[in-house]
């Protein structure tokens, strides 16, 4: 199930069956997969240094950090960054070494979704932002986040896992890169897309 996720991700409980390199064809397609006049964003646990810098009119790929140090290093290198924080780190804004960690607004307000976040410009879709977006750990495995034991991925348990497994079992005649490139063309003007509710950009074994 975690085949496209990096084996090094601390939230990944199945590193032995996970990716050790990026699917470059898929990454190229993903960066271009933006609806016309729309917005697209996603997250990756792969080392930010192995992913091209974000560009205008391309998908915003956020480096998803597992530790504060990772988050600060990524942010200070000019990367759009998110941080998966322990479930106890619930403040709206944290200031760490002069950098703001802004909690996802949807975690505090049930009326906010990705679609209406930031008045139509979702925080995670914004490039060249001066803050890190913080996601407080949630789900059945939330207490594992920030601990030495690997695990804590929110998509592992609950309803998300059913869709994830079903998607993984689907048979297709073309690569994910081709399928994504064709699918994005079918979306209406101005659509917003959050790629990868689960999974990553790794080359599946």
Which residues does each predicted region cover?
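Class I S-adenosyl-L-methionine
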Residues: 1-205
């Amino acid at each position: 199930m975690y085949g496209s996720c990096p084996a090094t991700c601390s939230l990944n409980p199945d590193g032995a069956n996970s990716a050790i390199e990026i699917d470059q064809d898929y990454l190229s397609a993903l960066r271009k997969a933006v609806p016309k006049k729309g917005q697209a964003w996603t997250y990756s646990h792969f080392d930010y240094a192995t992913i091209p810098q974000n560009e205008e009119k391309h998908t915003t790929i956020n480096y998803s950090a597992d530790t504060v140090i990772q988050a600060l290093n990524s942010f200070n290198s000019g990367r759009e960054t998110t941080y998966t924080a322990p479930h106890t780190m619930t403040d709206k804004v944290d200031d760490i070494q002069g950098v703001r960690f802004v909690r996802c607004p949807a975690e505090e307000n049930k009326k906010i979704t990705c679609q209406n976040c930031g008045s139509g410009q979702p925080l995670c879709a914004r490039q060249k932002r001066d803050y890190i977006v913080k996601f407080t750990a949630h789900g059945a495995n939330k207490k594992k986040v920030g601990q030495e034991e690997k695990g804590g991925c929110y998509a592992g348990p609950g309803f998300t896992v059913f869709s994830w497994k079903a998607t993984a079992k689907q048979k297709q005649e073309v690569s994910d890169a081709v399928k994504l490139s064709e699918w994005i063309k079918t979306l209406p003007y101005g659509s917003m897309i959050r790629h990868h509710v689960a999974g990553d950009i790794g080359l599946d074994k």
